[in-house]
């Protein structure tokens, strides 16, 4: 009775709504007994078949809305969604929080989700609502994915249909297709029917077009691969020819005909195996050195040109070094030191027992040896002492040079006969009380002035006339400053060696 009154009032106020002809239901199906519809509303048939889960939630919402609204306004129809009843009665429906409704509280859902009192409730009703929400969210996501896939399939079908219609008719078929569009805009329903019919016709002819396109595509791809492989091989041949020319130029000076034969063999190997870059020297792989990695066809197809260009440049850089034979150490020394006599360099090399690096160090350090039969006994001692530059430091205002040496015992002697004598090194006076080991192993300017300063005051050591800031050129010889003052000018610049060495 209430339904008929509400329907008559709606009909009197607003009349029958004017809908588009495509949306009007010509013969509505009989409503289900669980879903009565007001007689004054025209509803699409898809809206009349909601899922049962949605119906139960709508019934609960309608009951809650009826309890809160009281007798004001038109009560919603029992069993119908509250949104439909609200639209029919003229006021919009605001969504409510289902968890609050389970606990007897009505609260609007907008901005309420974070501050809901029962957001973490685990009762039976709230868990049921959470499960329903999860199922609904999964359904919505699935429908969105299906709609997206359908739209993509339609776009692909349109592309295939346009690809089919262009080659035979050319522009005319395209123009005809554009001319058919105005006919399809006569009405919404007619346009939809024409669109569906065209899609059905296109779906029937879409598979052969796609097959033809798929057959043509591998041929084009194969042609592209072959052209890329040919260009890559041409580039490799050019680079390898350049590297062989460089190698030929370097090996013609050293090896002559042998280099040409190795180049010919490597070129023949490369022509036999064009898919990979071989090393120009077959013996290089057996010798233990790493050969450049071979290029597979997948690298050539994928366009990895940068890697094989790097490999080719590396092989080109290593070609001259590999081709060079072991050189004579004496030739190396003569090329490094062209101003030195060959016999002199040969003596230094013999003294260093054939070690080129040690011989170069000896020449650079200024150690020139002229070994004779008389000095063979002293050669081992001379080998142990390295001639290094002495670093100068000051002790309580007195500057003298520390004697840098590999051996701690040879540079300093503490005998009393050494003071003032010209047959030995200028030793430190025993009065000073300095251990020669500490003086020899001490570093310049780090800790010597601290432990030496109490002993080297002018009052304690008045008899050590060290020359300030002396810079000794060699560790095996030293200038006698006290002896220089008493000798004449001929012996002033004389250098005193140890007793076991010959004076120059």
From Swiss-Prot:
InterPro entries linked to this entry: DM_DNA-bd (IPR001275), DM_DNA-bd_sf (IPR036407), DMA (IPR005173), DMRT (IPR026607), DMRT5_1_DMB_dom (IPR046472), UBA-like_sf (IPR009060)
Residue ranges of domain DMA in the record: 327-362
SMART domains named among the record's database cross-references: DM (SM00301)
Subcellular location per the Swiss-Prot or TrEMBL entry: Nucleus
Pfam family, one: DM
Main location group: nucleus
Alphabetized UniProt keyword annotations: DNA-binding, Metal-binding, Nucleus, Transcription, Transcription regulation, Zinc
Biased composition (Low complexity): 293-306
Presence of keyword Zinc: yes
Region (Disordered): 1-27, 170-192, 266-307
Any one GO molecular-function label of the UniProt entry: sequence-specific double-stranded DNA binding
Superkingdom of origin: Eukaryota
DNA-binding span(s): 97-144
Single GO biological process annotation from the record: ovarian follicle development
GO CC field: chromatin; nucleus
Ranges of biased composition (kind: Basic and acidic residues): 1-13
UniProt family annotation: Belongs to the DMRT family.
Tissue expression pattern: Expressed in liver, kidney, pancreas, prostate and weakly detected in testis and ovary.
Keyword Transmembrane helix: no
Name this polypeptide is given: Doublesex- and mab-3-related transcription factor A1
